[in-house]
Amino acid sequence: MFDDALPADMAVESGDPREPSVPLFPEELALVASAVEKRQLEFGRGRQCARAALRRLGFADRPLLSGDQREPLWPVGVVGSITHTQGLCVAAVGQQRDYAGVGIDVEPSAPLPRAVADRVASEAEMSALDSMPPLLAARLIFSAKEAFYKCQFYRTRQFLGFFDVSLELEAEGEFAVHLLVDAGPLLRGDRFRGRWRQRNGFLFSAIVMPSEHRR
């Protein structure tokens, strides 16, 4: 559904968590044994999408466990990201020789509550998106920043606040993230490009960080 938001050499798979899915590995089941049913369904479909994407890169099925920050632990040589919302899970993976990180986020294509919007988007960012309804623009800003935070975590192992970056739309379906603080090997002023799509009732954001030799 959103393959065109990511490079052609990355594998992207999506699915509906409400539909039946392939059983999880026992090690994965243990991670969500005490979770509510909705969380279990989203986790299961997300892992199923991730394995389907990995198969396209030539990797055999295996358990995908979680790190201490609940991030997926990918096979050696792989970068990836999983996202889900009501009615949709998406996974994207690529080769680590080509990419230093990838982050994706899917959201309902609906206005963000005002109280949340004020915590994730600056007035300048909102003004730059004046062609969209304000709270829908805030949803896009939230999604794009979430995608970047997942992507940069591969490099920095650091958490960033919503106002540690600024978002700028460059063209229809594209955006740029400007880093406003130093974060590990990433420096204040660094700029990263991403893409967003609005389809079938969803907003989707994606950003990749090329490996050093591809910069």
Which residue ranges define each predicted feature?
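Core catalytic alpha/beta fold that binds nucleotide/phospho-ligands
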Residues: 1-215
